């Protein structure tokens, strides 16, 4: 139930008062009011005015909000999300999106039976696509991944999975797993915060969106070593990734490798073979995997994997250069918007550190809540 609106109309402009700064954005028959008090430690609040019924609604807010600052500027993007630029914050930390009518928000609203909005941090540049590697037990995918990590330690990283099981001896929370309560992981799964999950021996295991995003934030490509069912779940999510299936030259060769381990009983081997046959059958599902790698010879397979990942290509995105040059340390606010771009104006003295006074923000977006919104392109306006 909403509360009756007071007898005043909120316009689609920034409203400043002694106590707060508000941005009111009209989208159809609703006005989204984004408010904060002038206390820099306060968080942003969201209220929605239904203009047809003149009632206020306080939505369920998903995702972590921007860090508290004194003020912000805002503008509507694609009629489905609101771009927020935090004032007084370096550019690379100041860009946020409040999703109000995206597919993710619509899905969550349907699940929860209430009005939902969601925060997503904006990131300049695309970032490297994560890599999903699947394959039956014994095919050698673990060895291939280990070789990648050894040769390119600064380029690749693993996401840390979540589990509800108790830590084993010498296991460290946040290093081996994120150990969590069942109620919490189930709640986050329902909120779409997990790319994939499975119930194993009474416990829940899963890969969260944040675990993958945090690796990308470090400038590395995240590797997900998951089974075919997990790969199917990731493919169905909003995450843009490269999907690779590693297969044996023949089923007989796979059985030979499993038996050569000498670490499992006949019953365990037969179970692994049954699972392997099912995974090999599923690997041919249309649209599931981008590449199939046959691991007949380990070194040859590894070289083919590196070619797939274009590891010899040292191309640098112009946005990466912009960030590395330190130009993102200046503070900006929204000046104007056109159909294809948003102009940002520097709040820093133009003579300081060679700061560019005007920047063009091209909104070629990818991703979004519950993860980051990537693909923002920045260029100076001469």
Swiss-Prot record:
Q: Does the keyword Cell membrane apply?
A: no
Give the subcellular location: Cytoplasm; Nucleus
The gene behind this protein is GK1
| Further comment found in the protein's record | Plants silencing GK1 have no visible phenotype.
Database matches in PROSITE patterns: GUANYLATE_KINASE_1, GUANYLATE_KINASE_2
Recorded hits in SMART domains, A to Z, give:
GuKc
Broad EC category: transferase
Q: Which GO terms describe its molecular function?
A: ATP binding; guanylate kinase activity
Q: What's this protein's name?
A: Guanylate kinase 1
Assembly, in brief, is: Monomer.
- Report the sequence similarity comment from the record: Belongs to the guanylate kinase family.
Q: Species name for this entry?
A: Oryza sativa subsp. japonica (Rice)
Q: Does the keyword Ribonucleoprotein apply?
A: no
What are the disulphide bonds in this sequence? none
Record lineage: Eukaryota, Viridiplantae, Streptophyta, Embryophyta, Tracheophyta
Binding annotation for ATP: 135-142, 295-296
